Amino acid sequence: MADSSVERRLFSFILSSMAFFLIYMSLRTMFAPPLPPEEDAIAEVDGETVEPAEDLVADTDASEPGEGEGEEANEDTDAVERPSSPTWSTLGSMDPTSGYVMLVTLNSRGGGIERIELTERKENGRLKYRRVDVRSGYLGYLAADPTATDLGIRVNVVGPGTPADLATASGVQGGLKPGDIITGFNQNNVNNLSMLREAMLETKPGESATVTVLRNEKSIDFTTTLTEHPLDLIRLAEHGGDDEVEGNLSRLSCLLTVGRVGRREIQSGEKTIEGMVDTGDLIWDASQDGDNVSYQLQLSDSEMKPASGKSVGLQRTYSLKPDSYSLDMDVQIDNRAEEAQELAYRIEGANGITLEGWWYSNKISPNWGGSAARDIVYKTTAEGHELVSGYALLKRAKNESEADDQTLFAPDSAPPARNLSYIGVDAQYFTVAMLPPEGQESLKTFRRAAANIIADPSAVPDNKERAVNASFYLDSAIADVPPGSSLKQSLRLFAGPKQPDVMEAYGLGDCIYYGWFSFVAKPLGGLLHLFSNVGNYALAIVLLTLCVRGLMFPLSRKAAINAQRMQELAPELKKIAEKHKDDMEARVRAQRELQQRVGFNPMAGCAPMFLQLPIFIGLYRTLSVDIELRQAAFASWTTWASNLAAPDMMYYWGDWMWDYLGGRGTGWLGPYFNILPMIVVSLFLAQQKMFMPPATDEQTAMTQKMMNYMTLVMGLFFFRVPAGLCIYFITSSLWGIGERILVKKTLPSKPHFDPATLQGAAAGGGTVDGKVNNSAGANGKKSSDGKPKTMADRLRERLGTPEEEAAPLPKDRKRPPSKKPGNKKRR
C-alpha cells in the first residue's frame, strides 16, 4: 500500500500540474489585454497644448545645404538633382580586434537603417550572440538584389571584418568589393540570391569556401573562411529566412520625414502628409567620414505644394563608437524658403526585430500572454514602464472602425505624460529603443508618440499573429522656423541584449520582467550562473537539480515513511469504507478520526511535490528571460541542443511533416523532432511501471491507465519546452528512481502503530475529546428506533434544537365528511 500511496501522490502531482498548466493557459487567453479605447491620434490645430520648440531652432550652418543657395533651393522637382541609384554604408565592424560590438548597414534610399548585426565576441573568439536557428556558414551581408540577373549576384555592400571582406585572391588586393558580380560559389554556378543561399546551406562555420566574382569583366576566384552567422537584430522582413511571415512588410528603420507644415500634418495610419512623396522612397545624398554617416534630402516647392508649404531640407547623421550598443542620431529639418514656416518632423522607430524562436518561445510579460514576439515598450514620468502588445496592435489594425495607430501620448496630454525616458521594440532577449542623448534623462520635445505595425493586417495568418512586425513613431514639437534656420534633435538608438548590467546602464532595466515568480527565478538564475563556472550550463542545471533534490531528501524520506504508515492504516481504512459505503460523510469523518487518533497526516507526503512546482516554474521563467542561457550549448562538440533555452532540435522534419503537426506556429510539435521530451516521458512511464503496484480491482486498473494516458498527453505539451527544462526533468526523475530504491532499504521494519489501537479506533463510533466513543447515543449514526439518522437530525442534535413536528403531506391529510343531499343520518 505504500506504493499505492505513491501512486496517488504521483497521480495528484500530474493532475495538479496539468490543471495548473491548462488554467494558466486559459487565463492567458481570457485576460489578454483589451484593446485600448480609440484616441484621437491627431489633435486639432487650435487645441494644441505643446509649445513651439523654439529652443531647438538654430541657424543653419553656412556649409549646410540651403544656406545661400538662393533660387536653387526653390526650384521645381525636375531641377532637384538626386542620385540615380542607392548606395550602402556601414558603421562598426565584425573584426574581433576592432572593439566594435555592432555592424550597422545604412541605405541611402530613405536614409534609414537596413540592418544591425551584433558582433561581440566571447573570450574564446566565438560570437557572443549568433543566429541560433542557422547552423551553416556565413559570408556576410551583401544587400544583394534577390531577383535573378543574366550575369550573377551584384554585391552592394561588404561589411568590414566579414568573410567577404577578408577573402583573398592571387594578385588582388583586399576582398570582395561593392559592384562585384558573384557568379559561383564552391564550384557551383549561382545567378540569384536564392541559389547562393541554397549553396550556403551545405557549409559549416570554419570551413573554407571559394567565391567566384566578375570584376571589370574579369573572373576572379576568392578564398575565404566562413564564420558563424551573427544575430541580425534588425533586418528587412524579406530577409527573415524560415522565420519570414506572410503579411509583414519590408521597411527601413528610423526613417525621417516631414510631419507637419502649417496646418497640414500626417493623418493616422499614413506615412506622409496627403499628396506628398514618401521620403523613404527617395534617394538621399550620402557622405561618410570615419564613424559618421550623413544623409541629406531637399524637397522642392512643387514637392511641398500638397502640404501648402515651401522648400525644406532634411538632414540626419549616424555615429557609432567602439564598445557601444547605442547608435547616435542627429536629425533636423531646414527651412529653405524665403519666409518662416511652421514645421515638425516625424521619426519612425525600429522594425524587423529578430523573430528567433517565436513559434516555441514564451515571452514573459505583464499582459497575461497578450504579448507577441515583438511588443512596444515605453516609459514616461506619468505612467512609468508600459508595454503595448503586438497582438493588440494587429487586432486594432484589423478593426476598420478604429485608427490603425495606437496613441501612446498626444499633444493635449499632460507634460509628465510626454516626458519620455525611452520607447522601443521589445523581443524575448533583445530590445531596440530610442533614448535621450547621453547626459540627458528624458525627451521632452515630442508632442505625440504612437505604436503601429509594419504589415498588411489582412495578410497575416491567424496562427502567426504573434510574429507581426510592430513599430512606433514620434512626432516632434511644432516650431516656427525662420528662413535659413533648422529644427534639430539628438537621439540615441540602443540595440542590444537584455543583460541586467547593460540594460541598467542605458536606463532600460524595467524591460527585464520575470513576472510573479521572480522571487524563485532570480535566485535560481544566480545559482545557475554560479554553477556555470564548471564550463557548461547543461552540467550547471544538473548540479542545480541535484542540489535542490539533495536538500529535499529529508522531506522525501519523511514522505516515504508516511507512505509506509499509510500502508499500515490501509486495512482499517478499507474496513471503514466498507462499513460506510452508503454514507460518504460518515466514511470521511470516520477515516479522519482514525488518522487523528493515531497521529497520521495524509498531506505530509505532498511537501516534495509542492516544493518542486515553484522550482519548475522558476526555472522555466529563468530560461525564458535570462539571456545567459540563450545560446548555451549542451556540449561544445555537437550542434544538437546548441541552445538550452530552445527545444533540442535533433532532426528537421518540417519539409515532409504534416503542417498541422510540424508547421511554424501552425503545428503542435513544430518543425523539429526533439528527443529530450521523449526521454522525459519515457522516464515518467518507467517510474510508474517500477513503483506502481499491480491493479487489484477494476477501479485501480482504470486509474493506472488514466495516469499513463495523461503522461503521454503531458509529453505532447512538453514537446517544445526548452532543452534546459528537459535536462532538469531527466535529472530529477533519475534522482527520484535512485532515491526510492535507497529509501526503501532504510525504512523502519517495525510497525508504526499498535494493532490493538488501530482495531479499537476503527471499531469505535467516533472520538470525543480524544477518547473512543462506542455508543450510538446522541452523536451515533442511528436513532432510538434503529433507523439511520439524516444529516438534518445530526445538525439539530449538535445545535440542541428540538425537532419540529412536520406538517402532514396533502395525501396524508384527513378529508372532512362530505354533506351531499340525501345522505343525512336517521334520528
Curated annotation (Swiss-Prot):
Residues 782-801 have a biased composition (Basic and acidic residues). The keyword RNA-binding does not apply. Residues 58-94, 758-827 are annotated as: Disordered. Required for the insertion and/or proper folding and/or complex formation of integral membrane proteins into the membrane. Involved in integration of membrane proteins that insert both dependently and independently of the Sec translocase complex, as well as at least some lipoproteins. Aids folding of multispanning membrane proteins. It is a multi-pass membrane protein. It comes from the Bacteria. The keyword Cell inner membrane applies. Interacts with the Sec translocase complex via SecD. Specifically interacts with transmembrane segments of nascent integral membrane proteins during membrane integration. InterPro entries: Membr_insert_YidC, Membr_insert_YidC_N, PDZ, PDZ_sf, YidC/ALB3/OXA1/COX18, YidC/Oxa/ALB_C, YidC_ALB_C, YidC_periplasmic_sf. Residues 84-94 have a biased composition (Polar residues). It is found in: Cell inner membrane. Residues 218-827 are annotated as: YidC. One of its GO terms (biological process) is protein insertion into membrane. Its main location: membrane. Residues 1-217 form the PDZ domain. Residues 812-827 have a biased composition (Basic residues). Keywords: Cell inner membrane, Cell membrane, Chaperone, Membrane, Protein transport, Transmembrane, Transmembrane helix, Transport. Residues 58-78 have a biased composition (Acidic residues). GO terms for molecular function: membrane insertase activity. This is Membrane protein insertase YidC. NCBIfam families: yidC_oxa1_cterm. The gene is yidC. It comes from Rhodopirellula baltica (strain DSM 10527 / NCIMB 13988 / SH1). GO terms for cellular component: plasma membrane. The chain crosses the membrane at residues 11-31, 524-544, 598-618, 666-686, 710-730. Belongs to the OXA1/ALB3/YidC family. Type 1 subfamily.
